[in-house]
């Protein structure tokens, strides 16, 4: 009888243990799920929104400096992708974009007059000229937003970074959604720029541009212990232009605002566009979105297909050493009359411009 009672107690004890173990396993599944904190939305796909840019995205081949182009065909489900990503897009106006043009006083007459006559005339309020010398005549004649940075006119790393530092601070002050930097030898195709940026949200981390190299740059990052570490990162070449969303620009502030940009540049001893890439890719770990819609004089511009020229975001032309490096676009102007081809492109985009030849007008 005693043995039977002991066996019974042992059985009850084992059943109790099994029941408790089962409860321990079931309790987490019975509790209501905890609410997760809001996570940042993913960046949109690196593609233009819709026609005409949809079919005109070009990327450089392995020889980026040579200017080779490879057309990227749109996927079959591109329209569905457009619908899925529509909530990422901004309904942009040109007034939402801060376009910074970097120049120097010696190019005021030769380059700025051409820009003010062409694309800048269509975006005067959105375009800000950053230079190193006062020019009252140009300011009054062209009605441009000219900002004298008081930086050196020398083409040195320090001078370039000084101007970029002022560009960044002025953009932050402007409260605009997008910062786009170009050089004074770029033509900005405004409709294409507007459509490209509309494919993204300005609150997201977006860094758009074209590398001048086919590989990441490697830099020696100086540290306080008198040593250095090697860092690799992509950067968008300033000669082709690049754009940064406001959301990302604000995150750059510790290394870029109020003169900190110059200090950061000295840390890696690289020019302004490289320093931008260093801050964004190496420090903030935000990847560059590579796009072939931006173009610089480093490329072979003659290889850009004529039928796609007006779909690009920026164009350029060769300097004194390579005057023939221009886009191949026909029009009423001869090469002698329009050596940069900027006037020809402008008259194709805006045929009703007063100075465009009549036969190109509607």
Curated annotation (Swiss-Prot):
GO MF annotation: an example: O-fucosylpeptide 3-beta-N-acetylglucosaminyltransferase activity
Binding site for substrate: 111, 184
Glycosylation positions in this chain: 150
GO biological process: one example: rhombomere boundary formation
Cytoplasmic side: 1-11
EC number assigned by the record: 2.4.1.222
Keyword Cytoplasm: no
Bilayer disposition of the protein: Single-pass type II membrane protein
Family: Belongs to the glycosyltransferase 31 family.
Protein name listed in UniProt: Beta-1,3-N-acetylglucosaminyltransferase radical fringe
């Amino acid at each position: 009888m005693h043995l039977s009672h002991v066996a019974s107690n042992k059985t009850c004890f084992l059943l109790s243990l099994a029941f408790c173990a089962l409860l321990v396993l079931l309790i987490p599944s019975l509790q209501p799920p905890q609410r997760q904190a809001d996570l940042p939305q993913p960046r949109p796909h690196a593609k233009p929104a819709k026609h005409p840019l949809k079919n005109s995205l070009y990327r450089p081949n392995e020889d980026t400096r040579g200017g080779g182009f490879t057309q990227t065909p749109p996927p079959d489900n591109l329209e569905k992708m457009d619908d899925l990503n529509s909530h990422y897009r901004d309904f942009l106006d040109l007034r939402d974009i801060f376009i910074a043009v970097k120049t120097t006083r010696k190019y005021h007459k030769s380059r700025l007059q051409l820009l003010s006559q062409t694309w800048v005339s269509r975006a005067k309020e959105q375009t800000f000229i950053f230079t190193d010398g006062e020019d009252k005549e140009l300011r009054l004649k062209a009605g441009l937003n000219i900002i004298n940075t008081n930086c050196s006119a020398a083409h040195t790393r320090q001078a370039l970074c000084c101007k970029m530092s002022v560009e960044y601070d002025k953009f932050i002050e402007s409260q605009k959604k997008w910062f786009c930097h170009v050089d004074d030898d770029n033509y900005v195709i405004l409709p294409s720029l507007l459509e490209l940026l509309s494919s993204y949200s300005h609150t997201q981390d977006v860094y758009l541009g074209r590398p001048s190299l086919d590989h990441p740059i490697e830099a020696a990052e100086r540290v306080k212990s008198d040593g250095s570490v090697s860092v690799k990162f992509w950067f968008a070449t300033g000669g082709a232009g690049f754009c940064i969303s406001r959301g990302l620009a604000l995150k750059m502030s510790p290394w870029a605002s109020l003169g900190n940009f110059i200090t950061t540049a000295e840390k890696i001893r690289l020019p302004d566009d490289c320093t931008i890439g260093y801050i964004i890719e190496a420090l903030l770990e935000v990847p560059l979105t590579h796009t072939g819609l931006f173009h610089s004089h480093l490329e072979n511009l003659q290889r850009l297909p004529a039928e796609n020229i007006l779909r690009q975001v920026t164009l350029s032309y060769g300097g004194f050493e390579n005057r023939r490096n221009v886009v191949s676009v026909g029009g009423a102007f001869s090469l002698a009359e329009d050596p940069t081809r900027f006037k020809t492109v402008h008259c194709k985009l805006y045929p009703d411009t007063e100075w465009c030849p009549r036969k190109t007008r509607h």
